[in-house]
Amino acid sequence: MSTDNSKIIYTITDEAPALATYSLLPIIQAYTASSGINVETRDISLAGRILANFPKYLTKEQRIDDALAELGELAQTPEANIIKLPNISASIPQLEAVIKELQAKGYDLPHYPAEPQNEAEESIKLTYAKILGSAVNPVLREGNSDRRAPASVKQYARNNPHSMGAWSKESKSHVAHMASGDFYGSEKSVTIDGATSVNIEFVAKNGDVTLLKSKLPLLDKEIIDASVMSKSALVEFFETEINKAKEEDVLLSLHLKATMMKVSDPVMFGHAVRVFYKDVFAKHAATFEQLGVDADNGIGDVYAKIARLPAAQKEEIEADLQAVYATRPEMAMVDSDKGITNLHVPSDVIIDASMPAALRASGMMWGPDGKQKDTKFMIPDRNYAGVFSAVVDFCRENGAFNPATMGTVPNVGLMAQKAEEYGSHDKTFTMKAAGTVRVVNSQGERLIEQEVAQGDIYRMCQVKDAPIQDWVKLAVTRARATGTPTVFWLDENRGHDEQMIKKVNTYLADHDTTGLDIQILEPVKACEFTLARVAKGEDAISVTGNVLRDYLTDLFPILELGTSAKMLSIVPLMNGGGLFETGAGGSAPKHVQQFEKENHLRWDSLGEFLALAASLEHVAVTTGNARAQILADTLDAATGKFLDTNKSPSRKVGELDNRGSHFYLAMYWAQALAAQTTDTELQASFSSVAQALTKQEEKIVAELNAAQGPAIDLNGYYFADTKLAEKAMRPSETFNTILSALL
């Protein structure tokens, strides 16, 4: 039996999954130790990435390696086996909060310079820019995405359906999007013929040329596109829809993805803030200028910065802000008790989480009075607004989906090598003046030209040919494995998709598709086709580009399972390695708030269990380690029993939480290992563990639950004290002693 090269990298990330790791990782390391599998960690947390990027500001003892860069290189090798937990895609307010916390702990980091005054500050801002937004996933995702609900999870959801709000045919909820002037309407796209490099140039009205991006290398057959979001059209859209929401008597909400689309979406968010609160911004323009208020950071930035003003001036501005609410429509709230609105912070309302939540809740959001109400969902760009609109219309007509009977929608997502919009950040610009932006190749040919006005957002995206070939192959593989109708969600009327459709048709011809139902539909039609099947209890595989991959792998799991954290998320890396992502949910800051308040962590680690089983199976297949396969099979059995016996964490303090759920997984896993007969040595070593855990079950659960109740301080939110966190997450001495016997 070969156990060489059996190494799994388990990532240290942020917030709730990071806390859960303190409890779960020791179990994983204990159970894999005798099978020749090394489970190592790498810190890709937000705090860790900041420290890794500023070594010259730190003492020798404070410096840490750049784990993300290391994993990015590893992902391009056949040896890669990485379990990736959710991490923070940082907004600027979050980034500033981490910097402040680290500075308070003696790390002499530079402040984030929002408006750099010199070259040194420019350089600091550029370094921080690499850490903002979705800085982790594009580096690790050297493959396309295969996301699905495992059979055991889907069956559990059918047997224990989560709550779904009833829909009324009279619901006034609807999606509002632009009719023109958006990215969709302006997109132009070409396929590159022969490797080259391009410059992105801005040509002013007077003919002056400014270089926006130089020598961007492009491969043969790569698709590029460029599009523009018109500032004037966007502002007019916000003006119109805000007024309409008042007339229609619905809540007003805005759904963007300011975390991932870190350059474009905060700017769009800022325009909504300035339009909604235009009277306040006009009246106090000089004060806001002096304070450095940035609407792109939300109206919360105004509240934060006026705190420095003399009391009378501060109160005047607060009264003016309050007066706005009397003349404007009611806004959807993030926290009605605290008065936190949809427009407070750009990272508070993220479309892939906020829209499914509203769809589950009768198409409503929460108003300022703490009650649910029909809502206008503003999704400015037409590229993806129609998909959400189709779901709203379907539910209004047909009622809410039934989790006990509905089908499932696995996704095959194109994302390798920073595909499409999610690789666009270094090619997205807010235009300082009117003119033309052109993409010019090394031969001087103009590939794409776009007219722009001052304040418009210009965005160029790219997708390489090899990832598209791999994506088509993965789609055919899943269609063949399941026999499920498989739909490419592509719109021939969109510039980029028109090029994609040509490639999909070409590469589908390379595969045997006999007997398979594979079709290409524009996203709204694809969504309607899928919804109709799912409502009848039938399945449909969605094959999508990068953004829809992100949106649909939240939308359907949340409707089907109540959460996207329970998805199996496999990224078969293009060079033979494996990346195993634990669910599609975020890092759950609200779970941490509850943990700090009453030492109860409700994070559900099911995503980690599923990813670990897939990772162990990958070890078995790639290294011939037979014990890894036994560990994977028994873990699957344990996870099934975990679901059947309902040992997921409760939301209520004093009941089973994340730590208790880990104990039950460990007990069921040990029992399964003790029951298998393929490897008698492994069976013998786990028999005593299974007996001890079974015998001490009551005592261990009592010890774990007894820790709950009082508030807990880990001396840090983003950069907790590891000793305190370990102590807090492993409070059962009995359990710890039994585990230590395996090491």
Curated annotation (Swiss-Prot):
Enzyme class: oxidoreductase
Pfam families per UniProt: IDH
Annotated binding of D-threo-isocitrate, by residue: S134, N137, R141, R147, K257, Y422, R549
UniProt keyword annotations, A-Z: Glyoxylate bypass, Magnesium, Manganese, Metal-binding, NADP, Oxidoreductase, Tricarboxylic acid cycle
Gene Ontology MF terms in the entry: isocitrate dehydrogenase (NADP+) activity; metal ion binding
Binding site for Mg(2+): D352, D550, D554
Highest taxon, organism lineage: Bacteria
Similarity annotation: Belongs to the monomeric-type IDH family.
Protein name: Isocitrate dehydrogenase [NADP] 2
Organism (species): Colwellia maris
Source organism phylogeny: Bacteria, Pseudomonadati, Pseudomonadota, Gammaproteobacteria, Alteromonadales
